[in-house]
Every structure is written in C-alpha cells, then in structure tokens.
C-alpha cells in the first residue's frame, strides 16, 4: 500500500514520523510531505529519512502548492492528511477522483468533560493554555 502522509506546520516531525513508523511496521512504502512553512523540519526529514531508511520504499517530498497538487493527482492506495479544513477539502476531492480512501485529521474538535465539582476558573485556564 503506497500512501502519502501530508503533515502540518505546527508539529512537522512528530506528525510525519508517527504514521511513517506505522507504514514501516506494516511493510508499506510511504511518502512524507511536511509543510513548506516548517522548512527546517522538512529539510531535516529530507536529509535523515533516505539516510536511515530504504530510499526505494520511503521518501520525503518538499514543496508548496504546485508540488502538492501534482502529488494529489497521482493514484495512491491511501492518503493521510493532517491540517486545516480548507486544504482537507482539496485532499478529499483529489482522493475522490481515484476513489482513494483517505483519512483527514482536521483538528478543531477538542472535547472536554467537566464534572460538577470542577473548579471552573482552573479548568478554563487549563483548557485555554493546555
């Protein structure tokens, strides 16, 4: 199963490598596409992944909209995207053209359960600031 993993700018290494580890464990080739906004992380991944992993099975691609658009036009077995809703819609539409299954992690939903006896001021601060 060949799949690209499109990662966001805010956690480019962790969110790139987590799915890559799963692909390696399953014996699946994968392409990692870190965000162009996090250029230093993208460059580090570009240097390190081919150095330590089979370059015939695992690759890193860097670039912005033209490179991503091209990659989305290709036939994949599965597409994994982490990022915003606007680009998520573009990824889903591209996947639909080839009836490619995809997983979109679009954030924005952070459910919190607050018990009746919770200190609301403290809970609000922790929810807001992590």
Residue ranges and their predicted role:
Residues 1-52, 99:
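Conserved small-residue-rich beta-alpha loop and adjacent elements
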Residues 20, 68-69, 92, 124:
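Generic hydrophobic/aromatic pocket-lining and core-packing "Φ" positions
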Residues 21, 78-82:
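Periplasmic-binding protein-like
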Residues 27, 58, 79, 108:
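Residue-level signal for inorganic ion chemistry
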Residues 28, 33-35, 62, 82-83, ...:
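Short beta->alpha connector loops at strand-helix junctions that form conserved
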Residues 43, 69-70, 84-93:
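Active-site core of PLP-dependent enzymes with the aminotransferase class I/II
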Residues 53, 86-130:
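ALDH superfamily catalytic-core signature
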Residues 60-77:
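A structured beta-alpha segment of the ubiquitous adenosine-cofactor-binding alpha/beta core
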């Amino acid at each position: 199963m060949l799949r690209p993993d499109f990662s966001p700018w805010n956690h480019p290494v962790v969110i790139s490598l987590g799915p890559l580890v799963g692909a390696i464990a399953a014996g699946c080739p994968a392409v990692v596409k870190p965000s162009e906004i996090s250029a230093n992380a993208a460059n580090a991944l570009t240097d390190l992944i081919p150095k330590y992993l089979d370059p015939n099975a695992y690759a890193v691609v860097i670039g912005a909209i033209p490179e991503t658009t091209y990659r989305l036009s290709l036939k994949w077995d599965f597409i994994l995207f982490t990022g915003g809703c606007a680009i998520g819609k573009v990824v889903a539409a591209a996947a639909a053209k080839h009836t490619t299954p995809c997983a979109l992690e679009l954030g924005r939903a952070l459910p919190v359960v607050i018990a009746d006896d919770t200190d609301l001021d403290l809970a609000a601060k922790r929810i807001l600031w992590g």
